[in-house]
């Protein structure tokens, strides 16, 4: 995999920075994957934290995240019958994470529930896991440990979606990739740009941070595509 070298660009001025950003955008865009090209029995969909508290209501809800709901719901529908994991950010009132973030997604409250657009009534026969997580990295959740122990040898393609790109999606993706690298296992991790998003707030510019997170994953061997066709 050939990746853009920011060192080679010799960034010194604001114009150099803008040029580097445009080169990153160019490197990431224009790739698509046909869902039909992936073996259904060896492919799984991961949806990170598409809960009410990050989409519709609460201290961490973002309209940017709400904007990907339609794309994600459509992908979820097309992947009926595939293995799926829905990560649900879920905390108690004394969560250590609240030292870094405002209280959110308290267990038993509406914020911690999966958004209605992704709830599937007709799920009989589907292998769906709903994994509650108490940290920003779903890899460490007990429910995911159970899933990976069961499916590690039979799933080769991991489609990772959800929010937010630079925190929970990034941490899970990089940890999963390094986990497989450590074991010398060939697995495809795929992140569709139209199905991940982050937030705007203060110095956290959503467009810029989203781009840097995608590029971070790209340089780590994760496939970044415009969408899953």
Whereabouts are the PLM-identified features?
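Active-site-adjacent betaalpha module
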Residues: 1-44, 92, 103-229
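A short alpha/beta connector and helix-capping loop motif
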Residues: 41, 45, 58-91
């Amino acid at each position: 995999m050939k990746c853009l070298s920011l060192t080679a660009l010799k960034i010194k001025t604001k114009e150099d920075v803008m040029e580097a950003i445009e080169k990153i955008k160019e490197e990431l865009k224009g790739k698509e994957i046909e869902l039909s090209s992936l073996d259904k029995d060896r492919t799984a969909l991961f949806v990170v934290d598409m809960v009410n508290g990050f989409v519709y209501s609460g201290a961490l809800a973002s309209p940017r995240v709400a904007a990907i709901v339609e794309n994600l719901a459509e992908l979820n529908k097309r992947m009926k019958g595939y293995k799926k994991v829905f990560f649900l950010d879920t905390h108690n009132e004394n969560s250590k994470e609240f030292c870094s973030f405002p209280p959110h997604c308290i267990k038993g409250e509406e914020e911690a529930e999966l958004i209605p657009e992704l709830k599937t009534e007709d799920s009989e026969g589907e292998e769906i896991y709903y994994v509650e997580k108490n940290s920003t990295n779903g890899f460490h959740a007990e429910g995911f440990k159970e899933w990976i122990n069961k499916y590690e040898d039979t799933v080769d393609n991991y489609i990772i979606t959800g929010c937010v790109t630079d925190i929970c999606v990034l941490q899970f993706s990089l940890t999963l990739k390094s986990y497989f690298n450590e074991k010398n296992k060939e697995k495809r991790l795929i992140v569709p740009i139209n199905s991940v998003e982050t937030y705007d707030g203060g110095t956290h510019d959503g467009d810029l941070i989203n781009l840097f997170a995608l590029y971070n994953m790209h340089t780590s061997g994760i496939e970044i595509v415009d969408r899953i066709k």
